[in-house]
Design a protein with these regions (language model features):
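Residue-level signature of beta-propeller blades and closely related beta-rich strand-turn architectures
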Residues: 109, 129-130, 189, 196, ...
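Blade-loop segments of beta-propeller domains
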Residues: 86-116, 127-181
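Structural signature of eukaryotic scaffold interfaces centered on beta-propeller domains
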Residues: 93-120, 175-186, 245-263, 318, ...
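Loop/turn-rich, solvent-exposed surfaces of beta-rich toroidal or solenoidal domains
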Residues: 108, 263-368, 374, 404
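Beta-propeller blade signature
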Residues: 137-150, 202-222, 279-302, 343-354, ...
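Sequence/structural signature of beta-propeller modules
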Residues: 2-91, 401-406
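Surface-exposed loop and turn segments in beta-propeller and other repeat-based domains
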Residues: 54, 58-96, 153-174, 214-249, ...
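Short beta-strand elements that form the blades of beta-propeller/WD-repeat-like
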Residues: 122-128, 189-193, 262-268, 326, ...
Length: 406
């Protein structure tokens, strides 16, 4: 579903297939690095928790999966150009209060596609947000999928948390109540979009094992134990990048290993081609460009953090309902959704071009994207693929399609 020419008024609807793309000043999109919250430095708070809890890394979690996914022998519903994939178990397929959104793989984390560095594992991560008006908001969970055996993937959910202090000065943590619409795994770091504010960062070398008996408690309980709503592991936030420039709706995120240096790109969702910045939670300098955008920041592979806090590329693209983005240099791939009953579409455009092109159909409810190059020597397909996750209960899939749509 593409768009009309560059929008000049907020109410313009997108009905035609051409889409207008324009390169705009990248310098207006800036971030500020943040290593603390109101309770103190993330590092100090996490160190305090480490004195109370058993610390593990992502390798240990992936080795401790407790659920079995269902291998897909063919493409899910409307998807084309299918390569591989799976469906969640019956409970996660049916649950209505947890909804999957973001996806990333060990082919993002390391160039050869294998995890850990120097290892032989193949893994995927998927983010979910909680939504139940009748219950306590449990925030965001992250699923670690062991995909080393594609015919029988296994997985485990963990809870994303922010380290805090209690009113009595004890180390604790709170749930992170965000949409988590896009995630990106780069080395030991996991980047998670914070829709109105920027990026949250998590160190996959630092998770904590917690007690599981209390499914309605998060953090330090009155019994002296720590809980994560029944999940065995919690992953604490380690850093943040807060938006300081022109407003940006951080909807999805993708890694670009084809750029020099490596970079990340962020895309914006809009219902009808006009980005909604009305929420009071948005932070920045107040400037608004309401046409959806793809914005790039360079990465430093030595420490896996941002190389610069100022964007190096920004393009507008009048495309509605963008749910995911990945880029290969100046070529950008978008997942475009169309509700609970219609197919999604993988579309592509080149920076500065005036049209998007359909690559192939995606499954109903398509969300985030992750690029998996055929050059990933350890975990390679015969051609490059793009991973996608879908959100609607009953039709939830994680699958890969050929990047060229063949």
């Amino acid at each position: 579903m593409a768009a009309a020419p560059f929008l000049t008024t907020a109410g313009t609807l997108l009905t035609s297939t051409p889409a207008e793309a324009a390169t705009i000043d990248a310098g207006q999109f800036t971030l500020a690095t943040r290593s603390s919250n109101s309770y103190g430095e993330f590092a100090d708070l996490t160190a305090g928790l480490a004195g109370k809890l058993t610390k593990v890394d992502a390798t240990a979690v992936i080795a401790d999966t407790n659920r079995t996914a269902i291998h897909l022998a063919s493409a899910p519903n409307t998807a084309k150009a299918f390569q591989t994939g799976f469906a969640w178990d019956s409970g996660d397929q049916a649950v209505t209060y947890w909804t999957p959104q973001g996806i990333t793989t060990s082919a993002d984390a390391y160039g050869n596609g294998l995890y850990p560095s120097g290892g032989t594992g193949k893994a995927l991560l998927v983010s979910w947000y909680f939504d139940d008006a009748t219950a306590t908001d449990k925030g965001t969970r992250l699923t670690f999928v062991d995909y080393s055996n594609a015919s029988a993937p296994t997985y485990r959910h963990v809870l994303l948390v922010e380290p805090v202090m209690t009113s009595t000065g004890e180390y604790s943590f709170d749930p992170i109540r965000k949409h988590a619409g896009g995630i990106m795994w780069y080395g030991n770091l996991l980047y998670v979009v914070d829709t109105f504010k920027g990026l949250r960062v998590f160190d996959l070398n630092t998770l904590f094992q917690v007690a599981t008996a209390e499914t309605e408690v998060c953090g330090l309980h009155t019994d002296g134990s720590y809980y994560g709503y029944g999940y065995k592991y919690v992953l604490p936030q380690s850093h943040a990048y807060d938006n300081t420039g022109t407003y940006l709706r951080y909807t999805a995120i993708g890694l670009d290993r084809a750029s020099t240096p490596d970079s990340l790109v962020v895309s914006e969702y809009s219902y009808a081609g006009v980005v909604d910045y009305s929420d009071k939670s948005f932070i920045g300098n107040g400037t608004k460009i309401e046409t959806p955008k793809v914005v790039r920041w360079d990465l430093d592979y030595t420490d896996r953090k941002l190389r610069s806090l100022t964007s190096t590329e920004a393009v507008t693209i009048s495309q509605q309902k963008i749910q995911g983005v990945v880029s290969r240099g100046s070529k950008h791939y978008l997942s475009v959704s169309d509700g609970e009953t219609a197919k999604g579409t993988l579309r592509t455009f080149t920076s500065g071009s005036d049209t998007t092109t359909a690559v192939c159909d995606l499954a109903i409810g398509c969300e985030d994207l992750s690029y998996h190059s055929s050059g990933a020597s350890g975990w390679a397909f015969s051609e490059s693929v793009i991973w996608n996750a879908t959100e609607y209960d009953g039709t939830r899939y994680v699958y890969a399609v050929h990047a060229d749509g063949s």
